[in-house]
A protein has these predicted regions:
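Interfacial loop/beta elements and low-complexity acidic/Ser/Thr-rich segments
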Residues: 1-168
Length: 168
């Protein structure tokens, strides 16, 4: 409990140039080695990981390493950096908001939806997460607190170019 299993395949196709992780294929959580190979499974570190449970996995084809799940404490925010995918678009410092990946816990959904490697606009709030550390890092930072009777000014470094409407 409180762990996930990272999987490294010892056989399969080569990972495409420019990528560091092998994409998910249908193989019943790595329990069907034949399906893994027939469905185009790639050799190396996998985006897919195993959650708590018992699995019948061929140790000659797959190496499984247990790691702790990630936690973001209360009053903290998780700053996400993705380690795989297409590079950020030129002139941007963070990847755009992507939906449907369950807070970066489904790397394949993130990549399929056009997610990019690097710093992300989206943050994660306090809680526990099944992050694949080969795919994502999460840096905890304190939430911004504005005291009563004060105001906060936000300066954004992401998003479309603004337009000066001041008339100057």
């Amino acid at each position: 409990k409180g762990k996930i299993g990272l999987v490294q395949a010892e056989g399969g196709k080569e990972i495409p140039v420019g990528r560091i992780l092998a994409r998910k294929v249908q193989c019943h959580n790595f329990q069907d080695a034949k399906a893994f190979l027939e469905n185009g499974g790639q050799k190396g570190r996998q985006t897919e990981f195993l959650t708590t449970g018992t699995y019948r996995i061929n140790p000659k084809l797959f190496r499984v390493t247990s790691v702790d799940i990630s936690f973001v404490k209360s009053n903290m925010v998780g700053i996400i950096t993705v380690l795989d995918g297409e590079p950020l678009e030129q002139g941007t410092i963070a990847g755009p908001h992507i939906t449907g990946h369950n807070n970066f816990q489904d790397p394949d959904a993130f990549l399929t939806a056009g997610g990019r490697r690097g710093l992300q606009e989206q943050v994660v709030l306090s809680g526990s997460y099944n992050f694949n550390p080969w795919f994502v890092t999460c840096e905890e930072l304190p939430m911004t607190e504005i005291p009563i009777s004060h105001v906060g000014v936000v300066v954004s470094f992401v998003g479309p170019e603004g337009q000066d409407v001041s008339g100057a």
